[in-house]
Design a protein with these regions (language model features):
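Positively charged, low-complexity/disordered segments
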Residues: 2-6
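Structured secondary-structure scaffolds
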Residues: 7-8, 12-225, 244-287, 291, ...
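Flanking scaffold residues of small Cys/His-coordinated metal-binding clusters
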Residues: 31, 437-440, 452-453
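Acidic, turn-prone loop/beta-hairpin segments
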Residues: 35, 82, 226-253, 284-376, ...
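A broadly conserved sequence feature marking short terminus-proximal activation segments
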Residues: 39-52, 381-383, 391-440
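Short Cys/His-rich "knuckle" micro-motifs
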Residues: 84-87, 452-457, 468-470
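Structured, non-catalytic alpha/beta "coupling" segments that mediate domain-domain communication
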Residues: 202-228, 321-333, 393-427
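Cys/His-rich metal-chelating microdomains
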Residues: 448-451, 461-464
Length: 470
């Protein structure tokens, strides 16, 4: 991580042995030095050095071996008085000087670099040599930060080798699963440690990818035909949508912060959990009835679709650096404009007006009560009392404080049941009873309500059908 620049690397450099720069090899970058045979001192003369530089510019570094020493030394010196060094520089000296001939010589790059990125073995290699050379010649580090990662191992934590037969060819993953699955594995791996890869690990990430893709599919389906004039102001939105935008803000702030810290593994985990736990298993489930069966131009439905539009714009921006092809595919399905790529957008700026921690705390408690209700519904289903949650009537005994949470909310929609009744008792944890709902099943929304005639519609669905038929 970047913290090593100020701590561990300083300790290592302080305790390091002297660095011998010369190597006796047949090929490499020469050390262009002449040594006085009598005194053993290297020649320091700007005229000679300028000749060497000019020669290298014309013929490359091989000119040191190809051009006679007299061409560099005379007439100021007698070439017979000097030994021409034939050693080459340590290869780490070559790579360590990239800050000078890569960053400083190009107008489209800046020096020092924002980040140096390499494996953990480079603390004694490239990072080390770059730091020494830049500090020694420029007085500053060549980078603002460094990021190191572990090595790729097989799924059992072993180094890959042909003899073990445990190598993984990225091309095979690209062929069988696609590039986004491989990118998801990279983003989902904690690079502070060694990274493991194998068939089961790729399958695990494929399952996660499918959940993320299904989230995008739900959003695209729910936003079909959405127009700009359908949007409503935040102040007019239902309470649940205001909670959703609060959470979008929280995740957005977290994603931006983690990007700055190169904490991609945590970004992936947070987005995945948000999509599966808070969206797919909670918000999407609750709003299916409103989206599928609600009055098309109602304020509640418009508020829901406005929030989903905001969510889609944020989610595709979050996913674009990781699932670049999937994010672009979803984006084009929504806007249908080849000139307007998701990769031309940036992570949105958070909207302070959406922050509402009190509302978030309230909905955390509602979600807890909902989890208790769903557990009882599941038990009733296992006992063959009901077949689906819409067949259920829920009776809840709870404290007045908990009951007040549901004021101005349709509790049956939150629990995805047909009927809910509350009774107040002094309880820390609500008590829940499940029974069969009274009435007949609406053939459109499938809720069981007393008002429904056999094979008929509930009052809400009758009104909506009239709107569509008018």
């Amino acid at each position: 991580g970047t913290g090593l620049v100020g701590s561990e690397m300083c300790i290592r450099d302080r305790n390091r042995p002297d660095w011998c720069l010369s190597r006796q090899r047949a090929w490499g970058i020469p050390i262009p030095v002449f040594v006085n045979k009598k005194t053993g001192e290297p020649l320091r003369d700007k005229i000679v050095i300028d000749r060497i530089v000019s020669s290298f510019k014309k013929g490359g570094s091989d000119a040191w071996f190809e051009i006679p020493a007299s061409n560099y030394l005379e007439p100021e010196y007698d070439a017979n008085d000097f030994e021409q060094i034939q050693d080459i520089a340590d290869v780490w000296f070559d790579s360590g000087s990239t800050h000078a001939f890569v960053l400083e010589d190009r107008d489209d790059l800046k020096s020092p670099a924002n980040l140096y990125l390499e494996g953990s073995d480079q603390h004694r290699g490239w990072f080390h040599s770059s730091l020494l050379e830049s500090v020694g010649s420029r007085g500053v580090a060549p980078f603002e930060g460094i990021l190191t990662h572990g090595f790729v191992l097989d799924d059992k934590g072993r180094k890959m080798s042909k003899s073990l037969g445990n190598t993984v060819n990225p091309q095979d993953i690209l062929r069988d699963y696609g590039a986004d699955i491989l990118r998801l594995w990279v983003a989902g791996s904690d690079y502070y440690e060694d990274l493991r890869i194998g068939p089961e690990i790729i399958k695990h990430h494929t399952d996660h990818y499918r959940r993320l893709r299904n989230t995008l599919r739900y959003l695209l389906g729910s936003l079909n035909g959405f127009q700009e004039n359908e949007k409503i102001d935040y102040s007019d939105m239902p309470q649940l949508e205001k909670w959703l935008l609060h959470r979008v803000n929280e995740v957005n702030n977290s994603v931006r912060e983690k990007i700055e810290g190169y904490n991609f593994h945590s970004i992936y985990t947070e987005i995945h959990n948000f999509c599966t736990i808070e969206l797919s298993s909670f918000y999407f489930e609750i709003r299916k009835d409103l989206l599928y069966c609600g009055e098309p131009n109602s304020l509640e439905r418009r508020g829901c679709r406005t929030a989903l539009d905001i969510l889609f714009n944020h989610l595709t921006a979050w996913l674009a650096p990781i699932l670049c092809f999937t994010a672009e595919e979803a984006w084009q399905c929504y806007i249908n404009d080849k000139e307007n790529s998701i990769h031309l957008k940036t992570i949105p700026i958070s909207v302070n007006n959406w922050n509402d921690e009190a509302l978030n705390i309230k909905w955390k408690r509602i979600r807890f009560i909902r989890s208790l209700v769903l557990a009882e519904i599941e038990e009733a289903r296992n006992n063959n009392l009901i077949k689906s949650s819409l067949q259920a009537k829920v009776e809840i005994k709870l404290s007045k404080e908990d009951k007040d949470l549901f004021e101005n909310l349709i509790a049956a929609d939150i629990f995805i049941t047909s009927e809910v009744s509350f009774s107040i008792e002094k309880l820390e944890t609500p008590k829940i009873k499940i029974d069969n709902a009274d009435g007949n099943k609406c053939s459109r929304c499938w809720k069981i309500l007393p008002e429904v005639k056999p094979e008929g519609l509930c009052n809400r669905c009758e009104d909506v059908v009239k709107i569509y038929c008018s």
